[in-house]
Amino acid sequence: MEINKVNNLLELFYNQYQTQDKTSVFLQPLKEVEKKYSWEDVYSNIIKLSEEISKYIKKGDRCLLISENRPEWMISDLSIMLSGGITVPAYTTYTERDYEYIIDDCSPTVLIISDKTQYLKIKNIIPKKKFIKKIIFFDVIEEFN
């Protein structure tokens, strides 16, 4: 594959997915174990998440992605692209005030949030923003179960 013939990150990922041996592409160290993601896992997660996102956005809508560096970040970014959305990445070090400014500026239709720590920073902002149609979490948040 010649990199100058690749049009976008989705195409690059798919080319790699097609040619790799389907072993682990990511290793995520967790508290007491390592979570492995195979190429097939990542591919199927991108498709599933993209299908979910597509229910709530139209082409060109923004999706705010609040996450640490972890495999789900890349999966989310590619899923947003596949859905026709625009990823608005946000640092996890932002304050509630920072997030409110970003949310007001980009009007995201979907929020993708890594964990409870990040959710608590924007929890009070969400009810005021009628344009937010869906919140997706990487980790389980008790409040939403």
Where do the protein language model's features map onto the residues?
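Flexible, non-catalytic linker and terminal segments flanking ANL/adenylate-forming cores
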Residues: 1-8
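Conserved AMP-binding/adenylate-forming core of the ANL superfamily
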Residues: 25-74, 78, 95-100
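Structural core segment of the AMP-binding/adenylate-forming
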Residues: 86-145
